Amino acid sequence: MIGNLNRKLRNRLSDGDWLPICTTVGGQNAIAISFDDGPSPCTTPTILHLLARFDATAAFFLCGERAERYPSLVEDIAAQGHAIYSHGYWHQRMDEMSPDAFARDLARTEAVLARFRPTPSPYILRLPYGSGHDSARVHAQLRSWRDDVQIAHWSHSFEDWTLADNCDSHATLQIRCDDAIVTALADRGFGGSILLLHEDAIGSASALSGAIAPLLLAALLRGIARYGIKTTTISASTDCSTLSRFVRFKAVR
């Protein structure tokens, strides 16, 4: 019992290193859609078409390596006015990187993304795999790189990288995506959520991986239109008090 209490305290206290973490957006009639791992020619063009068709907005957390490989897709995202943020260069777990490698990865990613949009401040990013969002050491390394870093986490994940597992057809995948949206919309906590989706998820072995995001997004946009839910941007957290740097009052999953 004492050991569990000590672990919980360690996850809540720091030496002033905790950064703000964004997990929700204001109001029950809005959600924020976010995509990790892009850009990808398998997904980005269709995603942008769907967002434009439904007059919706999204935040794209891009991997530097993919952004460098597909610059025209990043240009298209920026041209449509969607937010572009960092998701690391190689999509490596940041809680397993050395401080030097950590800083190089972040700097290299921003050097790529800065070609397409101004460097944001506060500097919102998403950690690959969500790795280290609960680690004071990772927060300290982020703060030493840029003092204005804020972590964009999420409050609803579709775990979409699993939807094509053992899936034998596009039609079956469509059913799974539709069911995932029905379940999400029935959740009382859905309104105000930051939603986590993936573009052609890194590490997925399924041949249908590239079809997941377009199918899921289409079902999502149809669903929120029926419920009168709008899309909004991920805004910087306003909880930047001195005390919040030392104590986290709310656990983040």
Regions of interest found by a model, annotated:
Residues 58, 84, 150-151, 231:
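Hydrophobic beta-strand scaffold residues
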Residues 235-253:
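C-terminal accessory extensions appended to soluble enzyme cores
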Residues 57, 174-176, 249:
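Juxtamembrane helix-loop transition sites at the ends of transmembrane segments
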Residues 28-30, 190-192, 243:
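Sequence-level motif detector for i,i+2 pairs with an aromatic at +2
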